[in-house]
Curated annotation (Swiss-Prot):
This is Probable TtuB-protein conjugate cleaving protease. InterPro entries: JAB_dom_prok, JAMM/MPN+_dom, VirAsm_ModProt. SMART domains: JAB_MPN (SM00232). The active site is at 47 (proton donor/acceptor). Keywords: Hydrolase, Metal-binding, Metalloprotease, Protease, Zinc.
């Protein structure tokens, strides 16, 4: 996986705007970006999946098991692990900032399945063979990734 091709984000904005996007930008420290990349490389050739959480920027990477029946070409976060992670975030006062997953053999673009199955109103961060990008789905609007 190549380095990011675009500047990473948050639902809340770096300068304020609690609860909303500020200029459609997601901020992620380089170390957490690399931690995410390492998780996804360990999952290859399967698609990996996880969450980014924090307040004004990504503060935590939460890998989740991919329980999809076809994990080489799709992902489905384990529902129980997802629920436990979301409850822990709530207890800790952190917000879900993004859902990440990998396309180990394809580009960092939403697949038709990614678009069809999008349910969460947070950016979907996709790590592909050509880098990493983030999108609001199903609309397809790109979210800038600012690496700190």
């Amino acid at each position: 996986m190549a380095p990011p091709s675009v500047p990473i984000v948050y639902a809340g904005g770096r300068g304020g705007c609690p609860g909303g996007y500020h200029g459609l930008v997601l901020y992620v420290p380089r170390g957490l970006l690399e931690e995410t990349r390492a998780h996804l490389l360990r999952e290859a050739p399967k698609e990996g999946v996880g969450l980014w959480a924090g307040r004004r920027e990504v503060e935590r990477v939460i890998p989740l098991p991919n329980v999809h029946p076809s994990p080489l070409t799709a992902y489905l976060a384990d529902p129980l692990a997802l629920l436990k992670a979301l409850k822990a975030l709530e207890r800790e006062g952190l917000s879900l900032l993004a859902i990440y997953h990998s396309h180990p053999k394809g580009p960092a673009l939403p697949s038709p399945r990614d678009i069809k199955e999008a349910r969460w109103r947070v950016p979907y961060v996709i790590f592909g063979t050509d880098g990493v990008r983030a999108f609001l789905l199903p609309e397809g609007q790109e979210v800038a990734l600012v690496v700190l």
